[in-house]
Design a protein with these regions (language model features):
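Conserved HGGG/HGGXW glycine-rich cap/lid loop of the alpha/beta-hydrolase fold
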Residues: 31-78
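Short beta-strand/loop motif that positions the catalytic acidic residue
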Residues: 233, 239-241
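Alpha/beta-hydrolase fold catalytic core
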Residues: 1-42, 63-66, 103-105, 287, ...
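Conserved alpha/beta-hydrolase catalytic His-Asp/Glu region
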Residues: 167-229
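Active-site loop/oxyanion-hole signature of alpha/beta-hydrolase fold enzymes
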Residues: 69-110, 284
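Catalytic active-site module of serine/aspartate enzymes centered on a nucleophile-bearing elbow/loop
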Residues: 262-292
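Acidic catalytic loop of the alpha/beta-hydrolase fold
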Residues: 244-248
Length: 292
């Protein structure tokens, strides 16, 4: 049993850490085997996130009928960072290269927050690579996210790397930051705090999160807004969002579900991280979409 209390079925496929190259540079990812069919690729979010911190419950639960791959995105978990700017198009191009080089063909593609924006970009720019699309608490759907001016200012001051170092050093501060993205702070386990602190230490070294915020924030708004292109999506789309998301409001997902021609919307009683806060509900939603 892992974070959130969702049991992992006996005999569930074990995810193994893999290393290789994407676009000729160092890459790491987690992979659980499957019996065939299109693999599922899951892209994690930003900040103190990482592949198996985001998807640790989902990977073994969804693998078996299909292989599941969860890459460490550039600047996270041992993958070389992107050359600047660290923008959604640059991140999406990396994800498309991962699919081509490591999967060899079309996949079911999902992403959370920053990773959701990258997944959406891939689906729009390289639709031949995406059979089905899963958008979880996704950035880039339009509408107001919180505090663009604050993010803009912070990304341009030399403080974000020391802040990440402070998170890595302080259990109390890390728990306080996580309480902003969890609807129920009681769901923040000691293991999650410890792993988030390790992820913060990585960001203190690589600066990928700061680079992403710097690339994506203007003085008055966030730069990526793909909501006007949602009608271009020909593939089935699943949107999963937390009703109590204080980072990206659920209204953004509702509007996106109305705009995408073949969209399905699942709202869970969580904050910004439904895969962590309600793994049973989240995995059931994805399994129904993928196997239905």
């Amino acid at each position: 049993m892992k974070e959130g209390g969702a049991p992992i079925a006996p005999g569930a496929p074990i995810a193994r850490r893999m290393r290789g190259a994407v676009l000729g540079r160092r890459a790491a990812w987690w992979e659980a085997p499957g019996r065939g069919g299109a693999p599922l690729v899951l892209l994690h979010g930003s900040g103190t996130d990482a592949a198996m911190l985001a998807w640790g419950e989902a990977v073994p639960a969804l693998a078996g009928p299909r292989a599941v791959l969860a890459p460490e995105l550039p600047g996270y978990g041992g993958t070389a960072t992107l050359r600047r700017p660290y923008s959604v198009p640059r991140l999406g191009a990396w994800a498309a290269a991962f699919i081509r080089e490591r999967c060899g063909g079309p996949v079911d593609l999902g992403g959370s927050s920053m990773g959701g924006a990258a997944a959406l970009w891939v689906a729009l720019e390289h639709p031949h690579l995406v059979r089905r699309l899963i958008l979880v608490s996704t950035y880039g759907l339009g509408g107001a996210a919180r505090r663009p001016r604050l993010a803009y200012a912070a990304s341009r001051l030399p403080i974000s790397l020391p802040v990440m170092g402070a998170l890595a050093a302080s259990e109390r501060l890390t728990r306080r930051v996580l309480s902003e993205v969890y609807a129920d702070p009681a769901r923040i386990s000691a293991d999650v705090v410890a792993r988030s602190r390790r992820a913060a230490l990585t960001q203190a070294r690589t600066g990928a999160f700061r680079a992403f915020v710097r690339a994506e924030t203007g003085r008055e708004h966030f730069r990526t807004d793909l909501s006007g292109r949602l009608r271009e999506l020909a593939m089935p789309v699943l949107l999963v969002h937390g009703l109590r998301d204080r980072v990206i409001p659920a209204s953004a997902a509702r509007r996106a579900a109305e705009a995408a021609p073949r969209a399905r919307l699942v709202l869970l009683d969580t904050g910004h991280l439904p895969a962590r806060e309600d793994p049973a509900g989240f995995n059931a939603a994805l399994a129904g979409f993928l196997d239905g």
